[in-house]
UniProtKB/Swiss-Prot annotation:
This is Toxin To33. Expressed by the venom gland. Keywords: Secreted, Toxin. It comes from the Eukaryota. It comes from Tityus obscurus.
Length: 10
């Protein structure tokens, strides 16, 4: 998990 901005829906 790296810099995930908006889509944490992955």
């Amino acid at each position: 998990i790296l810099n995930r901005c908006c889509n944490d829906d992955n």
